[in-house]
């Protein structure tokens, strides 16, 4: 089997018992499966939920807290308990785990985004298993990933993974809720995530987690757009992850074999960078940047909104609506001076492009 880079996301419901506390046997089962993958030569990045679930009972909460301060306090207690458990179980297989806690700002800030990539890659190259979780104890509610499903998709893109495996307590995607409809049919394979599928998916999470099936499909859609195929399902035993890679997993495979990876600069522009302004372009410019692989030139710019600096990321709108996002080579004030100007009106030593094609990402609304 070809050696692959695999991101594995395991949710709280697959790590805890009926009371919501850490289930040592479940964790041991997952660790053995990851160890089996490592033994085959695969690189593994582990997105683990469970910090809040591991900590809330320790704080005396009868159930998972719903307030931000309650969740953050539980995460502060639970994250260390969770990591200690992983360290002990991975030690049985001579594997060293490494903890990385991320916030949305770590992706939004360009330099921190690069640092996150460099750190994960260094750990992988040295044979460790990075265990990544959102830094729940300090995350601002408005600036979170939403749940670890989306975090796993963004991480899989960041490190150019070959596959994202999302393990859950449901063995794949069904055409209706199998708990309520015994005749529900499972999809063994779907090529893409459609709006119809998203509309059918239940959105509620479990009592010990935040991510329902809809969040997993949204994560899968994001991963596919970043060039990463996805598996959503369940599994038991030491070889469950190996069986998933072989195509024998108990769940749903999502995506096509010819997906193209997206470089990190474009990922940052598309999914993480703050938007500082808006540029409106004419039909010819819209066609050039969305269909013909061209750069945006001043001649096609018709309007500018926002006081953005050079190097900022802006949205670009054409006659058909949002065309995409790009990193501008002009400030708003500079662009006002040259908008509508033809290329032959520039001196040869001047830079012409408003947004270079390498700094552009098309977006379909």
From Swiss-Prot:
Transmembrane segments: none annotated. It is found in: Cytoplasm. CDD domains: AAK_G5K_ProB, PUA_G5K. Signal peptide: none annotated. Pfam families: AA_kinase, PUA. Its EC number is 2.7.2.11. GO terms for cellular component: cytosol. Keywords: Amino-acid biosynthesis, ATP-binding, Cytoplasm, Kinase, Nucleotide-binding, Proline biosynthesis, Transferase. One of its GO terms (molecular function) is glutamate 5-kinase activity. The keyword Transmembrane does not apply. The keyword Transit peptide does not apply. Belongs to the glutamate 5-kinase family. Catalyzes the transfer of a phosphate group to glutamate to form L-glutamate 5-phosphate. This is Glutamate 5-kinase 1.
């Amino acid at each position: 089997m070809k050696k692959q880079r695999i991101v594995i996301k395991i949710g709280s419901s697959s790590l805890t018992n009926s009371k919501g506390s850490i289930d040592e046997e479940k964790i041991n089962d997952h660790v053995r499966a990851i160890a089996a993958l490592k033994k085959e030569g695969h690189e593994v990045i582990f997105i683990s939920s469970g910090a809040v679930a591991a900590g809330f009972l320790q704080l005396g909460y009868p159930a998972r807290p719903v307030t931000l301060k309650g969740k953050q306090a539980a995460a502060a207690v639970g994250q260390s308990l969770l990591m200690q458990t992983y360290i002990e179980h991975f030690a049985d297989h001579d594997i060293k785990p490494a903890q990385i806690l991320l916030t949305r700002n770590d992706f939004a800030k360009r330099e921190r985004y690069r640092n996150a990539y460099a750190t994960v890659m260094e750990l992988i190259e040295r044979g460790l298993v990075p265990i990544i979780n959102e830094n729940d104890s300090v995350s601002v509610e408005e600036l979170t990933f939403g749940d670890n499903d989306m975090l796993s998709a963004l991480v899989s893109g960041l490190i150019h993974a070959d596959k994202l495996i999302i393990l859950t307590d449901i063995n794949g995607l069904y055409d209706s809720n199998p708990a309520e409809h015994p005749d529900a049919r499972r999809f063994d394979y779907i090529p893409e995530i459609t709006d119809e599928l998203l509309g059918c998916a239940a959105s509620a999470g479990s009592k010990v987690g935040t991510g329902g099936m809809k969040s997993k499909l949204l994560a899968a859609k994001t991963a596919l757009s970043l060039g990463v195929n996805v598996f959503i399902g369940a599994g038991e035993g030491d070889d469950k992850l190996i069986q998933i890679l072989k195509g024998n997993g108990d769940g749903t495979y999502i995506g096509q074999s010819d997906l193209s990876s997206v470089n990190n600069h474009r990922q940052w522009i598309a999914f993480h960078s703050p938007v500082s302004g808006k540029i409106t372009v004419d039909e010819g410019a819209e066609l050039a940047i969305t269909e013909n692989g061209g750069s945006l030139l001043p001649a096609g710019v018709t309007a500018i909104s926002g006081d953005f600096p050079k190097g900022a990321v802006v949205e670009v709108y054409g006659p058909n609506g949002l065309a995409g996002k790009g990193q501008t080579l002009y400030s708003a004030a500079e662009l006002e001076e040259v908008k509508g100007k033809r290329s032959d009106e520039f001196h040869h030593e001047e830079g012409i492009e408003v947004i270079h094609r390498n700094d552009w990402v098309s977006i379909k609304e």
